[in-house]
Amino acid sequence: MALRLFNTMSHQKEEFKPREEGKVGMYTCGPTVYNYFHVGNGRMLVVFDMIRRYLLYKGYDVTFVQNFTDIDDKIIKRGQEEGRDPLELAQDYIGEYFKDAAALNLMPASIHPKATDHIPEMIEIIKGLEEQGLAYAVDGDVYFAVDKLPAYGKLSGRTLEDMQAGARVEVGERKQNPMDFALWKNAKPGEPFWESPWGKGRPGWHIECSAMSLKYLGSGFDIHGGGGDLVFPHHENEIAQAEGYLHGETFARYWMHNAFLTINQQKMSKSLGNFFTVREILEHFPGEVIRFYLLGTHYRSPLDFDDENLQMAQKGLERLQTSIRLADEALGRQGQNSADAASGQKLRAAAEEARREFAEAMDDDFNSALAYASLFELGKAINAHVQAYPYSSEGLLKARATLWELADVLGFDLAKPANQAEAGNQKLDQVMELLLEVRAIARKKKDWEMSDLIRDRLKDLGIVLEDTPQGARWTLK
């Protein structure tokens, strides 16, 4: 099955055909670094990390570019509030970004360009637009003239008339059209600035991504991604700038956007003040669980945030980790191979079926939610095999390797515990070892009441004991 993805530009699923066979160029709009990123931003970051990983799994050579907006009105305002240099503040939050990104198991981008390192490229594009009559300068500001580009609005599906009717923009003497947007902003006292043909100033937000993506990926690159809130105006304006500068040449071939994360059915955003940063959530849940939660719903479907859903995600991840642990225990045991060839073949077939179903789900617009089902089915097959043949390695090695590999494609290390810290998992193992030892002593003394009490209380806590000829084993429900 060929890989198909939903292209926002065409509003339908399309077969993915890269610009260059075997290679993929991807660009996603990274954070504006004036604070820790919130879990709504985190969804976008995790989604496109997952997409990148799956493309790598399919054998593509992926160049993944994700920028940092390190100069912006919000950064300047935050710097003024804290009495700090805005560029230093942005650099500090870039460092904090990488800490939270590591917790979510985000692969570092191939290139992480910063806006302030690419001012010359932005100026070059603005000059080109001005030469073509697509931009105009007013007292040190430069604006893009949207009515000079007939295709403006093609990504969002809006006409210029509709935009003007719904615009919350006051028509001032400076703009020729209320929808015209800033390419370059004249410097205000106390703000960072760069020299330009229009005087001292700084770039507008939209020009930054156009310049950086074109520099590192060239025109017609494969995938441009971001959150659904960026379709308009940010991505619409990126297209206008880039394709205007390129004389109509295609800027990016596939546009992908994830749906909003909501709280009580209301979009999560910093502007609304109804957000949680990933840093805050990491105080209560590990990054693996947050990631598992974010990918448990198809990326184009809205996702409502609450603790209960995170707890369910933690249990789901623990189920997969338990399957790996049981497989490792069985593979590490000494004893006779008690499984027959048929049972081993059945487990190998389950592994092959899981791989097929996983690929089918992911090839259908990266349906990670459906891909989860293939992992859980394989986990169940491993558990059943280990229970029936506790000393057998027949087919188990392949099944274990397949489960681990497919989970890794989604960015999960099933050897890493889903609880708050590695030490917590080790302590659980140690406590269970002690309890099983106490229970074994009770059974040896024929103290069945104590033995059953331990078993029943553990069951109430979601821990199931199984008595086997080789001793008691425990699993998380």
From Swiss-Prot:
Q: Which SUPFAM superfamilies match?
A: Anticodon-binding domain of a subclass of class I aminoacyl-tRNA synthetases (SSF47323), Nucleotidylyl transferase (SSF52374)
**Cofactor(s) annotated in UniProt:** Zn(2+)
GO CC annotation: cytosol
| UniProt cross-references to SMART domains, sorted A to Z | DALR_2
Cystine crosslinks: none
Residue ranges of the motif 'KMSKS' region: 267-271
Q: Which domain of life is it from?
A: Bacteria
Q: What is the UniProt remark on how the cofactor binds and its stoichiometry?
A: Binds 1 zinc ion per subunit.
Q: Does the keyword Repeat apply?
A: no
**What is the catalytic activity of this protein?**
tRNA(Cys) + L-cysteine + ATP = L-cysteinyl-tRNA(Cys) + AMP + diphosphate
Q: Where is this motif: 'HIGH' region?
A: 31-41
Residues recorded as binding ATP, renumbered to this chain, are: K270
A GO molecular function assigned to this protein is: ATP binding
Q: Return the protein name.
A: Cysteine--tRNA ligase
* Source species of the chain: Desulfitobacterium hafniense (strain Y51)
> Which gene is this protein's source?
cysS
